[in-house]
């Protein structure tokens, strides 16, 4: 509930973009900036034979303040695993 449709880039929902964060498959929340969505190719950076314990996504930190949803559960597992 509350999750908008996928943008087609690795399943990133509208809430990820709106609140400037990404919830990864392991539950970690990563702060994003607008360049992350334009420059990062989720499909290219996920290898099928890579061990999931060693596979890491880039951590991008944005200095702009984030607005959080008021009283609602935001979203879950938008990053492609």
Swiss-Prot record:
Protein family membership: Belongs to the herpesviridae cytoplasmic envelopment protein 3 family.
Q: According to its UniProt record, where is this protein located?
A: Virion tegument; Virion membrane; Host cell membrane; Host Golgi apparatus membrane
Q: What does this protein do?
A: Plays an important role in the cytoplasmic envelopment of tegument proteins and capsids during the assembly and egress processes. Also participates in viral entry at the fusion step probably by regulating the core fusion machinery.
| Residue spans crossing the bilayer | none
HAMAP family listed in its UniProt record? HSV_CEP3_alphahv
Basic residues bias: start-end ranges? 66-81
Q: Does Cytoplasm show up as a keyword for this record?
A: no
Source organism, top-level taxon: Viruses
Assembly, per entry: Interacts with cytoplasmic envelopment protein 2; this interaction is essential for the proper localization of each protein to the assembly complex and thus for the production of infectious virus.
Q: Where does lipidation (N-myristoyl glycine) occur on this chain?
A: 2
Q: Which parts of the sequence are annotated with region: Disordered?
A: 47-81
| GO terms under biological process | anatomical structure morphogenesis; viral budding from Golgi membrane
Motif range for Di-leucine-like internalization motif?
22-23
**A Gene Ontology cellular-component term:** viral tegument
What InterPro entries would the database entry show?
A: Tegument_UL11_Herpesvir
Annotated keywords: Host cell membrane, Host Golgi apparatus, Host membrane, Lipoprotein, Membrane, Myristate, Palmitate, Phosphoprotein, Virion, Virion tegument
Entry membrane topology: Lipid-anchor
Q: What is this protein called?
A: Cytoplasmic envelopment protein 3
What does the UniProt record tell us about how this protein is modified after translation? Myristoylation and palmitoylation (probably on one or more of the nearby cysteines at the N-terminus) enable membrane-binding and Golgi apparatus-specific targeting and are essential for efficient packaging.
Q: Where is this region: Asp/Glu-rich (acidic)?
A: 41-47
């Amino acid at each position: 509930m509350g999750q908008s449709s996928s943008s087609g880039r690795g399943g990133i929902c509208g809430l990820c973009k709106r609140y400037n964060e990404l919830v990864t498959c392991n539950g970690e929340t990563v702060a994003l900036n607008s360049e992350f969505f334009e420059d990062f190719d989720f499909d290219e950076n996920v290898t099928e034979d890579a061990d999931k314990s060693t596979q890491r996504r880039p951590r991008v930190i944005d200095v702009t303040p984030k607005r959080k949803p008021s009283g609602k559960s935001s979203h879950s597992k938008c990053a492609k695993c």
